[in-house]
Protein backbone atom coordinates (compact mmCIF):
# COMPACT_ATOMS: atom_id res chain seq x y z
CA UNK A 1 0.00 0.00 0.00
CA UNK A 2 1.21 3.48 -0.81
CA UNK A 3 1.72 5.67 2.23
CA UNK A 4 1.63 9.46 1.76
CA UNK A 5 4.86 11.11 2.90
CA UNK A 6 3.79 14.72 2.58
CA UNK A 7 0.40 16.22 1.79
CA UNK A 8 1.99 19.35 0.33
CA UNK A 9 4.26 17.57 -2.15
CA UNK A 10 1.95 14.63 -2.81
CA UNK A 11 4.72 12.12 -2.23
CA UNK A 12 3.80 8.49 -1.67
CA UNK A 13 6.10 5.62 -0.80
CA UNK A 14 6.10 1.87 -0.50
CA UNK A 15 8.57 -1.00 -0.38
CA UNK A 16 8.33 -3.89 -2.84
CA UNK A 17 8.67 -7.49 -1.73
CA UNK A 18 12.23 -7.63 -3.09
CA UNK A 19 13.24 -4.69 -0.92
CA UNK A 20 13.19 -1.90 -3.50
CA UNK A 21 11.82 1.34 -2.12
CA UNK A 22 9.42 3.27 -4.34
CA UNK A 23 8.43 6.94 -4.19
CA UNK A 24 5.63 8.27 -6.41
CA UNK A 25 5.00 11.99 -6.93
CA UNK A 26 1.81 12.60 -8.95
CA UNK A 27 1.81 15.97 -10.72
CA UNK A 28 -1.18 16.59 -12.98
CA UNK A 29 0.42 19.75 -14.37
CA UNK A 30 3.28 17.81 -15.93
CA UNK A 31 2.94 16.67 -19.57
CA UNK A 32 5.35 13.79 -19.03
CA UNK A 33 6.79 11.54 -16.38
CA UNK A 34 10.27 10.98 -15.01
CA UNK A 35 11.67 7.67 -13.80
CA UNK A 36 14.74 7.93 -11.60
CA UNK A 37 16.39 4.94 -9.93
CA UNK A 38 19.04 5.54 -7.30
CA UNK A 39 21.52 2.85 -6.29
CA UNK A 40 23.24 3.44 -2.97
CA UNK A 41 26.77 3.00 -4.24
CA UNK A 42 29.34 5.55 -5.32
CA UNK A 43 33.04 6.18 -5.41
CA UNK A 44 33.19 6.26 -1.59
CA UNK A 45 32.31 2.56 -1.60
CA UNK A 46 35.24 1.55 -3.80
CA UNK A 47 38.05 -0.47 -2.30
CA UNK A 48 41.67 0.49 -2.84
CA UNK A 49 42.66 -0.87 -6.23
CA UNK A 50 39.11 -0.49 -7.53
CA UNK A 51 38.92 3.29 -7.93
CA UNK A 52 36.57 4.14 -10.78
CA UNK A 53 34.33 1.07 -10.61
CA UNK A 54 31.18 3.00 -9.63
CA UNK A 55 31.57 5.37 -12.57
CA UNK A 56 32.52 2.50 -14.88
CA UNK A 57 29.19 0.88 -14.08
CA UNK A 58 27.34 4.06 -14.95
CA UNK A 59 28.60 3.39 -18.49
CA UNK A 60 28.20 -0.39 -18.43
CA UNK A 61 24.52 -0.03 -17.56
CA UNK A 62 23.93 1.28 -21.10
CA UNK A 63 25.76 -1.65 -22.72
CA UNK A 64 22.79 -3.93 -23.26
CA UNK A 65 21.27 -6.96 -21.57
CA UNK A 66 21.40 -10.71 -21.88
CA UNK A 67 17.65 -10.60 -22.53
CA UNK A 68 18.04 -9.01 -25.95
CA UNK A 69 18.54 -5.26 -25.53
CA UNK A 70 21.56 -4.33 -27.65
CA UNK A 71 24.32 -1.95 -26.62
CA UNK A 72 23.10 1.67 -26.86
CA UNK A 73 19.54 0.47 -27.56
CA UNK A 74 18.33 1.65 -24.14
CA UNK A 75 19.05 5.28 -24.98
CA UNK A 76 17.87 4.96 -28.58
CA UNK A 77 14.57 3.43 -27.47
CA UNK A 78 13.87 6.25 -25.02
CA UNK A 79 14.72 8.88 -27.62
CA UNK A 80 12.47 7.19 -30.20
CA UNK A 81 9.41 8.07 -28.10
CA UNK A 82 10.55 11.66 -27.57
CA UNK A 83 12.23 11.11 -24.23
CA UNK A 84 15.69 11.51 -22.79
CA UNK A 85 17.88 9.39 -20.53
CA UNK A 86 21.13 9.79 -18.68
CA UNK A 87 22.97 8.88 -15.49
CA UNK A 88 25.43 10.27 -12.98
CA UNK A 89 27.84 9.03 -10.32
CA UNK A 90 28.72 10.73 -7.05
CA UNK A 91 30.48 9.74 -3.85
CA UNK A 92 27.49 8.04 -2.26
CA UNK A 93 25.11 7.12 -5.08
CA UNK A 94 24.68 6.34 -8.76
CA UNK A 95 21.44 7.30 -10.48
CA UNK A 96 19.79 6.55 -13.82
CA UNK A 97 16.81 8.38 -15.25
CA UNK A 98 14.39 8.60 -18.13
CA UNK A 99 12.06 11.52 -18.87
CA UNK A 100 9.32 10.39 -21.25
CA UNK A 101 5.78 11.20 -22.38
CA UNK A 102 3.20 9.84 -19.94
CA UNK A 103 2.25 7.03 -22.31
CA UNK A 104 5.81 5.70 -22.28
CA UNK A 105 6.08 5.19 -18.51
CA UNK A 106 5.83 1.42 -18.83
CA UNK A 107 8.60 1.43 -21.43
CA UNK A 108 10.95 3.32 -19.11
CA UNK A 109 10.21 1.00 -16.19
CA UNK A 110 10.68 -2.08 -18.36
CA UNK A 111 14.07 -0.83 -19.54
CA UNK A 112 15.22 -0.21 -15.97
CA UNK A 113 13.97 -3.63 -14.87
CA UNK A 114 15.75 -5.36 -17.73
CA UNK A 115 19.14 -3.88 -16.99
CA UNK A 116 18.78 -4.47 -13.27
CA UNK A 117 18.05 -8.17 -13.72
CA UNK A 118 19.84 -8.97 -17.00
CA UNK A 119 22.79 -6.62 -17.50
CA UNK A 120 25.30 -7.94 -20.03
CA UNK A 121 28.57 -7.78 -18.11
CA UNK A 122 30.90 -9.19 -20.77
CA UNK A 123 34.57 -8.93 -21.69
CA UNK A 124 33.65 -6.97 -24.81
CA UNK A 125 31.48 -4.47 -22.95
CA UNK A 126 34.08 -4.07 -20.22
CA UNK A 127 36.84 -3.36 -22.75
CA UNK A 128 34.67 -0.87 -24.65
CA UNK A 129 33.45 1.08 -21.64
CA UNK A 130 36.86 1.09 -19.98
CA UNK A 131 38.21 2.97 -23.01
CA UNK A 132 35.22 5.33 -22.98
CA UNK A 133 35.86 6.21 -19.34
CA UNK A 134 39.59 6.68 -19.94
CA UNK A 135 38.85 9.03 -22.83
CA UNK A 136 36.40 10.96 -20.64
CA UNK A 137 39.13 11.35 -18.03
CA UNK A 138 41.57 12.61 -20.65
CA UNK A 139 39.09 15.17 -21.97
CA UNK A 140 37.69 16.40 -18.65
CA UNK A 141 40.74 16.21 -16.41
CA UNK A 142 44.10 15.28 -17.95
CA UNK A 143 43.99 17.67 -20.93
CA UNK A 144 42.18 20.51 -19.18
CA UNK A 145 43.84 23.46 -17.41
CA UNK A 146 43.63 22.87 -13.66
CA UNK A 147 42.09 19.48 -14.41
CA UNK A 148 43.91 17.93 -11.47
CA UNK A 149 42.55 20.50 -9.02
CA UNK A 150 39.68 18.33 -7.77
CA UNK A 151 42.01 15.42 -7.14
CA UNK A 152 44.38 17.67 -5.19
CA UNK A 153 41.54 19.24 -3.19
CA UNK A 154 40.03 15.90 -2.21
CA UNK A 155 43.39 14.44 -1.29
CA UNK A 156 44.31 17.55 0.69
CA UNK A 157 41.01 17.75 2.52
CA UNK A 158 40.34 14.08 3.21
CA UNK A 159 43.57 12.21 2.59
CA UNK A 160 44.29 9.44 0.13
CA UNK A 161 42.81 6.65 2.28
CA UNK A 162 39.52 8.43 3.08
CA UNK A 163 36.44 7.28 1.08
CA UNK A 164 36.07 10.85 -0.26
CA UNK A 165 39.79 11.19 -0.98
CA UNK A 166 39.58 10.39 -4.70
CA UNK A 167 37.35 11.69 -7.53
CA UNK A 168 34.59 9.58 -9.05
CA UNK A 169 36.29 9.43 -12.47
CA UNK A 170 38.65 6.86 -11.00
CA UNK A 171 42.19 5.67 -11.61
CA UNK A 172 43.44 4.58 -15.03
CA UNK A 173 45.77 1.92 -13.56
CA UNK A 174 42.87 0.49 -11.54
CA UNK A 175 40.61 0.46 -14.59
CA UNK A 176 43.31 -1.18 -16.71
CA UNK A 177 43.83 -3.85 -14.06
CA UNK A 178 40.12 -4.64 -13.72
CA UNK A 179 39.06 -8.08 -14.90
CA UNK A 180 35.61 -9.44 -15.60
CA UNK A 181 35.41 -11.20 -12.23
CA UNK A 182 36.13 -7.89 -10.47
CA UNK A 183 33.34 -5.97 -12.16
CA UNK A 184 30.88 -8.87 -11.92
CA UNK A 185 31.48 -9.00 -8.17
CA UNK A 186 30.96 -5.23 -7.89
CA UNK A 187 27.70 -5.50 -9.80
CA UNK A 188 26.28 -8.38 -7.78
CA UNK A 189 27.27 -6.68 -4.53
CA UNK A 190 25.64 -3.31 -5.10
CA UNK A 191 23.11 -3.54 -7.95
CA UNK A 192 20.28 -5.28 -6.14
CA UNK A 193 16.67 -4.26 -5.45
CA UNK A 194 17.15 -3.72 -1.72
CA UNK A 195 19.92 -1.21 -2.44
CA UNK A 196 17.81 0.93 -4.77
CA UNK A 197 15.18 3.66 -4.58
CA UNK A 198 12.81 4.12 -7.53
CA UNK A 199 11.22 7.55 -7.95
CA UNK A 200 8.35 8.13 -10.40
CA UNK A 201 7.26 11.75 -10.80
CA UNK A 202 4.93 13.57 -13.14
CA UNK A 203 1.75 12.67 -15.01
CA UNK A 204 0.95 9.50 -13.08
CA UNK A 205 -1.56 8.53 -10.41
CA UNK A 206 -0.11 7.23 -7.16
CA UNK A 207 -1.81 3.85 -7.41
CA UNK A 208 -0.84 3.48 -11.08
CA UNK A 209 2.78 4.17 -10.21
CA UNK A 210 2.74 1.46 -7.55
CA UNK A 211 1.13 -1.12 -9.82
CA UNK A 212 3.63 -0.50 -12.61
CA UNK A 213 6.60 -0.45 -10.25
CA UNK A 214 5.49 -3.80 -8.86
CA UNK A 215 4.87 -5.20 -12.34
CA UNK A 216 8.32 -4.37 -13.68
CA UNK A 217 10.83 -3.70 -10.89
CA UNK A 218 9.05 -5.98 -8.44
CA UNK A 219 9.86 -8.87 -10.76
CA UNK A 220 13.61 -8.47 -10.13
CA UNK A 221 14.83 -11.36 -7.96
CA UNK A 222 15.36 -10.72 -4.27
CA UNK A 223 19.07 -10.59 -3.49
CA UNK A 224 20.59 -13.15 -1.15
CA UNK A 225 22.85 -12.23 1.73
CA UNK A 226 23.24 -8.94 3.52
CA UNK A 227 24.40 -5.73 1.92
CA UNK A 228 28.01 -4.93 2.76
CA UNK A 229 28.77 -2.29 5.35
CA UNK A 230 29.52 0.92 3.52
CA UNK A 231 33.05 2.22 3.95
CA UNK A 232 33.29 4.86 6.65
CA UNK A 233 35.91 7.52 7.16
CA UNK A 234 36.54 10.26 9.72
CA UNK A 235 34.66 13.49 9.12
Describe the residue ranges of each PLM region:
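M16/insulysin-pitrilysin zinc metalloprotease superfamily fold
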Residues: 63-67, 99-132
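Stable alpha-helical elements in mature extracytoplasmic
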Residues: 49, 53, 70, 74, ...
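Acidic/histidine-enriched alpha-helical segments
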Residues: 79, 120-138, 205, 224-235
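An aromatic/glycine/proline-enriched structural segment found at the starts
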Residues: 2-3, 160, 164, 168, ...
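M16/MPP (pitrilysin/insulinase) zinc-metallopeptidase core fold and M16-derived inactive scaffolds
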Residues: 34-99, 165-169
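N- or domain-start disorder-to-order transition segments that initiate the globular core
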Residues: 2-31
Amino acid sequence: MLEPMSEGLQLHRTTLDNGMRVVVNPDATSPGVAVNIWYQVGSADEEVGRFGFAHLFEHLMFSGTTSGIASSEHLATVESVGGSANASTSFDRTNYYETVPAGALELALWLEAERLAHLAVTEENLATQREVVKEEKRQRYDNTPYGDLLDLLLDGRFGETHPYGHPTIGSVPDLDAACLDDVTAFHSTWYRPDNAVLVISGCVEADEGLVLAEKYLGAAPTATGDLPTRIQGPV
